[in-house]
Amino acid sequence: MVDFDALHAIIAPEAEAMGLALVRVAFFGGDSDPTLQVMAERPDTRQLTIDDCADLSRRISDRLDALEEAGQDPIDVAYRLEVSSPGIDRPLTRPADFADWAGHEAKIALKEKLDGRQRFNGTLVGIDGDVVTISDKEGVEHKLPFGAIDTAKLVLTDKLIAATVPLSAEGADEMEEEGQD
């Protein structure tokens, strides 16, 4: 069994020590491929470099190894650690995500049906208190309690691509030239 509160309490300080914001901690894969997935980002760029991923992975791994040696491992099975950025079609996990990405298309699934529906697709309007608003393709606004949301993620669109500026394109032209030989 996995203690998510304990995992979050262990992982969040490691991310924060690097100046990173934790986006999601998840455990999936079942018995065949148990995986601890950690998504983080730099708050100023909303991105994560490969070096950031490697450094955070080492910090988390070292911390979990030390807890295991002390008999306090929050995960009682062998697992694979995966550290990554949230990606362009990122999950929306924190209230601030719904404000930050207002105006972009999203898919939201609720834990239980609300007004006969469990899934909502449309444009994020934002969040007010603990109520997320999404406008469907007909322009109907749906008010969803943040606590009722099971999963939410951005939908890859041209608008989202344009809004997501890469950290650096340095070296891209050299890669293209190398591939042309």
From Swiss-Prot:
Entry-linked HAMAP family: RimP (MF_01077)
Name used for this protein in its record: Ribosome maturation factor RimP
Cellular compartments annotated: Cytoplasm
Protein's GO biological process: ribosomal small subunit assembly; translation
Function: Required for maturation of 30S ribosomal subunits.
Classification lineage: Bacteria, Pseudomonadati, Pseudomonadota, Alphaproteobacteria, Sphingomonadales
Transmembrane segments: none
Family: Belongs to the RimP family.
GO cellular component: cytosol
